[in-house]
Amino acid sequence: MASVNIKPLEDKILVQANEAETTTASGLVIPDTAKEKPQEGTVVAVGPGRWDEDGEKRIPLDVSEGDVVIYSKYGGTEIKYNGEEYLILSARDVLAVVSK
């Protein structure tokens, strides 16, 4: 995972989607047109967090760079940067962190 010059704002998270499965458990090859959009990815960058209600302290996020996360199927904004595809998600679109 290369370093990226994109710094998310507030509670936003930059994720690079993990590759979708290319074969089934029985060995059948899945064509690109039939693959489901992946819902798992690696966190590349994390914003500093939202401000609290008083505007005095930032509320830190529950994820950090390098975490593998599962995110909402339709959440986030897809972007392309330096030939790579990324997803910018709000912290609320992250459903779980996968344990290593």
Swiss-Prot record:
The keyword Cytoplasm applies. It holds the Pfam family Cpn10. One of its GO terms (biological process) is chaperone cofactor-dependent protein refolding. One of its GO terms (cellular component) is cytoplasm. One of its GO terms (molecular function) is protein folding chaperone. The keyword Chaperone applies. Transmembrane segments: none annotated. InterPro entries: Chaperonin_GroES (IPR020818), Chaperonin_GroES_sf (IPR037124), Chaprnonin_Cpn10_CS (IPR018369), GroES-like_sf (IPR011032). Keywords: Chaperone, Cytoplasm. Its main location: cytoplasm. It is found in: Cytoplasm. HAMAP family: CH10 (MF_00580). Heptamer of 7 subunits arranged in a ring. Interacts with the chaperonin GroEL. Belongs to the GroES chaperonin family. PANTHER family: 10 KDA HEAT SHOCK PROTEIN, CO-CHAPERONIN GROES. Together with the chaperonin GroEL, plays an essential role in assisting protein folding. The GroEL-GroES system forms a nano-cage that allows encapsulation of the non-native substrate proteins and provides a physical environment optimized to promote and accelerate protein folding. GroES binds to the apical surface of the GroEL ring, thereby capping the opening of the GroEL channel. This is Co-chaperonin GroES.
